[in-house]
Amino acid sequence: MGKGDPNKPRGKMSSYAFFVQTCREEHKKKHPDSSVNFAEFSKKCSERWKTMSAKEKSKFEDMAKSDKARYDREMKNYVPPKGDKKGKKKDPNAPKRPPSAFFLFCSEHRPKIKSEHPGLSIGDTAKKLGEMWSEQSAKDKQPYEQKAAKLKEKYEKDIAAYRAKGKGEAGKKGPGRPTGSKKKNEPEDEEEEEEEEEDEDEEEEDEDEE
Protein backbone atom coordinates (compact mmCIF):
# COMPACT_ATOMS: atom_id res chain seq x y z
CA MET A 1 0.00 0.00 0.00
CA GLY A 2 1.20 3.54 0.58
CA LYS A 3 4.57 2.36 1.85
CA GLY A 4 6.47 5.63 1.99
CA ASP A 5 3.44 7.93 2.18
CA PRO A 6 1.81 8.25 5.62
CA ASN A 7 -0.80 10.64 4.19
CA LYS A 8 -2.31 8.08 1.82
CA PRO A 9 -5.88 7.18 2.89
CA ARG A 10 -6.28 3.81 4.58
CA GLY A 11 -7.69 1.27 2.13
CA LYS A 12 -11.41 0.47 2.27
CA MET A 13 -12.47 -2.67 4.11
CA SER A 14 -14.93 -5.28 2.87
CA SER A 15 -17.86 -6.55 4.94
CA TYR A 16 -15.96 -9.81 5.48
CA ALA A 17 -12.87 -7.90 6.68
CA PHE A 18 -15.02 -6.08 9.26
CA PHE A 19 -16.45 -9.42 10.35
CA VAL A 20 -12.95 -10.91 10.80
CA GLN A 21 -11.87 -7.82 12.75
CA THR A 22 -14.89 -8.26 15.07
CA CYS A 23 -14.05 -11.97 15.54
CA ARG A 24 -10.48 -11.04 16.42
CA GLU A 25 -11.63 -8.51 19.01
CA GLU A 26 -14.03 -11.07 20.52
CA HIS A 27 -11.20 -13.62 20.69
CA LYS A 28 -8.89 -11.11 22.41
CA LYS A 29 -11.53 -10.36 25.05
CA LYS A 30 -12.17 -14.04 25.75
CA HIS A 31 -8.51 -15.14 25.58
CA PRO A 32 -6.36 -12.04 26.26
CA ASP A 33 -3.18 -14.04 26.87
CA SER A 34 -3.40 -16.67 24.15
CA SER A 35 -1.83 -16.21 20.73
CA VAL A 36 -3.88 -16.74 17.58
CA ASN A 37 -3.21 -19.52 15.07
CA PHE A 38 -4.05 -17.48 11.96
CA ALA A 39 -4.69 -20.42 9.62
CA GLU A 40 -7.10 -21.99 12.10
CA PHE A 41 -8.66 -18.63 12.98
CA SER A 42 -9.24 -17.72 9.29
CA LYS A 43 -10.81 -21.10 8.66
CA LYS A 44 -13.23 -20.71 11.58
CA CYS A 45 -14.16 -17.17 10.48
CA SER A 46 -14.79 -18.37 6.93
CA GLU A 47 -17.03 -21.21 8.14
CA ARG A 48 -18.92 -18.91 10.49
CA TRP A 49 -19.42 -16.30 7.73
CA LYS A 50 -20.90 -18.93 5.40
CA THR A 51 -23.53 -19.94 7.97
CA MET A 52 -24.62 -16.37 8.77
CA SER A 53 -27.96 -15.05 7.54
CA ALA A 54 -28.26 -12.01 5.25
CA LYS A 55 -29.67 -10.09 8.23
CA GLU A 56 -26.60 -10.89 10.35
CA LYS A 57 -24.26 -9.93 7.50
CA SER A 58 -26.10 -6.64 6.82
CA LYS A 59 -24.46 -4.99 9.86
CA PHE A 60 -21.00 -5.64 8.37
CA GLU A 61 -22.17 -4.64 4.88
CA ASP A 62 -23.32 -1.27 6.25
CA MET A 63 -19.92 -0.81 7.90
CA ALA A 64 -18.22 -1.60 4.56
CA LYS A 65 -20.46 0.90 2.71
CA SER A 66 -19.68 3.74 5.11
CA ASP A 67 -15.96 2.86 4.99
CA LYS A 68 -16.05 2.92 1.17
CA ALA A 69 -17.70 6.37 1.30
CA ARG A 70 -14.94 7.52 3.70
CA TYR A 71 -12.24 6.11 1.41
CA ASP A 72 -13.73 7.68 -1.76
CA ARG A 73 -14.03 11.04 0.01
CA GLU A 74 -10.43 10.93 1.26
CA MET A 75 -9.07 9.78 -2.12
CA LYS A 76 -10.66 12.81 -3.83
CA ASN A 77 -8.57 15.09 -1.64
CA TYR A 78 -5.45 12.94 -1.74
CA VAL A 79 -2.50 14.12 -3.83
CA PRO A 80 0.20 11.44 -4.25
CA PRO A 81 3.80 12.63 -3.77
CA LYS A 82 5.67 13.50 -6.97
CA GLY A 83 7.46 10.57 -8.54
CA ASP A 84 5.56 8.12 -6.34
CA LYS A 85 4.77 4.61 -7.57
CA LYS A 86 4.15 5.62 -11.20
CA GLY A 87 7.82 5.69 -12.15
CA LYS A 88 8.56 2.47 -10.29
CA LYS A 89 6.56 -0.06 -12.25
CA LYS A 90 6.83 1.40 -15.72
CA ASP A 91 9.55 -0.76 -17.28
CA PRO A 92 7.91 -3.84 -18.88
CA ASN A 93 11.35 -5.47 -19.28
CA ALA A 94 12.05 -5.53 -15.56
CA PRO A 95 12.12 -9.07 -14.13
CA LYS A 96 8.84 -9.98 -12.50
CA ARG A 97 8.47 -10.93 -8.86
CA PRO A 98 8.55 -14.72 -8.41
CA PRO A 99 5.47 -16.59 -7.13
CA SER A 100 5.40 -17.94 -3.59
CA ALA A 101 5.00 -21.61 -2.70
CA PHE A 102 1.30 -20.95 -2.01
CA PHE A 103 0.76 -19.39 -5.46
CA LEU A 104 2.42 -22.38 -7.13
CA PHE A 105 0.13 -24.67 -5.13
CA CYS A 106 -2.91 -22.61 -6.22
CA SER A 107 -2.01 -22.68 -9.92
CA GLU A 108 -1.69 -26.47 -9.74
CA HIS A 109 -4.89 -27.17 -7.80
CA ARG A 110 -7.23 -24.45 -9.12
CA PRO A 111 -8.21 -26.34 -12.35
CA LYS A 112 -9.19 -29.37 -10.25
CA ILE A 113 -11.40 -27.29 -7.94
CA LYS A 114 -13.00 -25.56 -10.93
CA SER A 115 -13.82 -28.88 -12.59
CA GLU A 116 -15.23 -30.34 -9.34
CA HIS A 117 -17.21 -27.18 -8.45
CA PRO A 118 -17.94 -25.39 -11.76
CA GLY A 119 -20.29 -22.85 -10.16
CA LEU A 120 -17.85 -21.78 -7.43
CA SER A 121 -17.07 -18.05 -7.34
CA ILE A 122 -13.50 -16.74 -7.57
CA GLY A 123 -13.60 -15.74 -3.90
CA ASP A 124 -14.83 -19.17 -2.76
CA THR A 125 -12.23 -20.90 -4.96
CA ALA A 126 -9.50 -18.83 -3.28
CA LYS A 127 -10.94 -19.68 0.16
CA LYS A 128 -10.95 -23.38 -0.67
CA LEU A 129 -7.34 -23.20 -1.89
CA GLY A 130 -6.34 -21.42 1.33
CA GLU A 131 -8.01 -24.14 3.40
CA MET A 132 -6.34 -26.90 1.36
CA TRP A 133 -2.93 -25.24 1.78
CA SER A 134 -3.32 -24.92 5.56
CA GLU A 135 -4.19 -28.64 5.73
CA GLN A 136 -1.00 -29.67 3.87
CA SER A 137 1.80 -31.18 5.95
CA ALA A 138 5.30 -29.67 5.88
CA LYS A 139 6.36 -32.62 3.69
CA ASP A 140 3.55 -31.93 1.17
CA LYS A 141 4.46 -28.24 1.04
CA GLN A 142 8.17 -28.96 0.45
CA PRO A 143 8.10 -29.38 -3.38
CA TYR A 144 6.32 -26.02 -3.78
CA GLU A 145 8.69 -24.32 -1.36
CA GLN A 146 11.72 -25.72 -3.21
CA LYS A 147 10.38 -24.56 -6.58
CA ALA A 148 9.56 -21.12 -5.14
CA ALA A 149 13.10 -20.88 -3.70
CA LYS A 150 14.60 -21.69 -7.14
CA LEU A 151 12.41 -19.09 -8.84
CA LYS A 152 13.36 -16.54 -6.18
CA GLU A 153 17.06 -17.30 -6.73
CA LYS A 154 16.61 -16.86 -10.49
CA TYR A 155 14.72 -13.60 -9.93
CA GLU A 156 17.51 -12.24 -7.73
CA LYS A 157 20.08 -13.02 -10.45
CA ASP A 158 17.85 -11.49 -13.13
CA ILE A 159 17.19 -8.33 -11.15
CA ALA A 160 20.91 -7.90 -10.44
CA ALA A 161 21.69 -8.30 -14.16
CA TYR A 162 18.81 -5.96 -15.05
CA ARG A 163 20.10 -3.26 -12.71
CA ALA A 164 23.67 -3.67 -13.97
CA LYS A 165 22.41 -3.47 -17.55
CA GLY A 166 20.46 -0.32 -16.71
CA LYS A 167 23.58 1.34 -15.32
CA GLY A 168 25.63 0.27 -18.35
CA GLU A 169 23.06 1.55 -20.83
CA ALA A 170 22.84 4.88 -19.07
CA GLY A 171 26.51 5.41 -19.95
CA LYS A 172 26.61 3.92 -23.46
CA LYS A 173 24.36 2.35 -26.06
CA GLY A 174 26.54 -0.45 -27.38
CA PRO A 175 25.46 -2.49 -30.45
CA GLY A 176 26.53 -5.70 -28.68
CA ARG A 177 23.82 -5.26 -26.00
CA PRO A 178 20.76 -6.84 -27.68
CA THR A 179 22.44 -10.26 -28.03
CA GLY A 180 23.00 -10.47 -24.29
CA SER A 181 19.48 -9.33 -23.51
CA LYS A 182 18.01 -11.90 -25.90
CA LYS A 183 19.59 -14.71 -23.92
CA LYS A 184 18.12 -13.22 -20.78
CA ASN A 185 14.62 -13.09 -22.16
CA GLU A 186 14.33 -16.77 -22.97
CA PRO A 187 14.35 -18.05 -19.37
CA GLU A 188 12.19 -15.09 -18.41
CA ASP A 189 9.37 -16.41 -20.58
CA GLU A 190 8.88 -19.24 -18.12
CA GLU A 191 8.89 -16.78 -15.28
CA GLU A 192 6.31 -14.63 -17.02
CA GLU A 193 3.97 -17.59 -17.25
CA GLU A 194 4.41 -18.17 -13.54
CA GLU A 195 3.86 -14.48 -12.90
CA GLU A 196 0.63 -14.43 -14.89
CA GLU A 197 -0.62 -17.19 -12.64
CA GLU A 198 0.53 -15.27 -9.63
CA ASP A 199 -1.31 -12.14 -10.73
CA GLU A 200 -4.44 -14.20 -11.20
CA ASP A 201 -4.04 -15.61 -7.68
CA GLU A 202 -3.53 -12.18 -6.23
CA GLU A 203 -6.73 -11.00 -7.88
CA GLU A 204 -8.50 -13.97 -6.36
CA GLU A 205 -7.11 -13.23 -2.95
CA ASP A 206 -8.29 -9.62 -3.20
CA GLU A 207 -11.74 -10.76 -4.20
CA ASP A 208 -11.69 -13.21 -1.35
CA GLU A 209 -11.17 -10.39 1.10
CA GLU A 210 -14.11 -8.56 -0.33
Curated annotation (Swiss-Prot):
It is found in: Nucleus; Chromosome; Cytoplasm; Secreted. Its main location: nucleus. Residues 9-79, 95-163 bind DNA. GO terms for cellular component: chromatin; condensed chromosome; cytoplasm; extracellular space; nucleus; perinuclear region of cytoplasm. Disulfide bonds join C23-C45. The modification Phosphoserine is found at S35, S100. Pfam families: HMG_box, HMG_box_2. The modification N6-acetyllysine is found at K3, K30, K43, K90, K114, K141. Belongs to the HMGB family. Interacts with POU2F2, POU2F1 and POU3F1. Component of the RAG complex composed of core components RAG1 and RAG2, and associated component HMGB1 or HMGB2. Component of the SET complex, composed of at least ANP32A, APEX1, HMGB2, NME1, SET and TREX1. Directly interacts with SET. Interacts with LEF1. This is High mobility group protein B2. It comes from Sus scrofa.
